[in-house]
């Protein structure tokens, strides 16, 4: 059974490109454009992994990660934060909020696929 990745990004174009690339690699994809939608889908759909943009219009990525971690139904799901912000303080904030990793955009498909496989293969 294919693994499911929840792609969370408010930029529709980036979300569609990333989703299409991951689909072509054999993943099932769910998408969310806001933090609220991401939390709801994480809890209801229980994807195998979440790719989470840090800057969302309603709830910032670290707060989304905290909400996902605080719900028993979704606390186990690996979360990879993605952002154009590259300072160490952003990475630190993401990891302290419960994200499992933090990648700086632009991110190559190979790096994303490697990270997804790393987390999915070492399921909690």
Regions found by a protein language model. Name each.
Residues 12-30:
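Two-component/phosphorelay signaling modules centered on CheY-like receiver
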Residues 15, 57, 75, 87, ...:
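The feature encodes the CheY-like receiver
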Residues 26-33, 41, 103:
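Short hydrophobic/Thr-rich beta-strand motif most characteristic of the beta2 strand and flanking loop
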Residues 45-51, 56:
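Active-site beta3 strand of CheY-like receiver
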Residues 107-116:
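C-terminal output helix
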């Amino acid at each position: 059974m294919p693994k499911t990745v929840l792609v969370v990004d408010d930029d529709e174009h980036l979300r569609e490109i990333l989703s299409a690339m991951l689909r072509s690699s054999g993943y099932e994809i769910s998408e969310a454009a806001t933090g609220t939608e991401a939390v709801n889908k994480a809890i209801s759909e229980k994807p195998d992994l979440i790719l989470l943009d840090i800057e969302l219009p309603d709830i910032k990525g670290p707060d989304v990660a905290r909400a996902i971690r605080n719900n028993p139904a979704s606390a186990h799901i690996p979360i990879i934060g993605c952002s154009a912000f590259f300072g160490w303080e952003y990475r630190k904030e993401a990891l302290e909020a419960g994200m499992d990793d933090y990648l700086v955009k632009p991110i190559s498909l190979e790096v994303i696929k490697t990270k997804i496989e790393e987390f999915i293969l070492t399921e909690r």
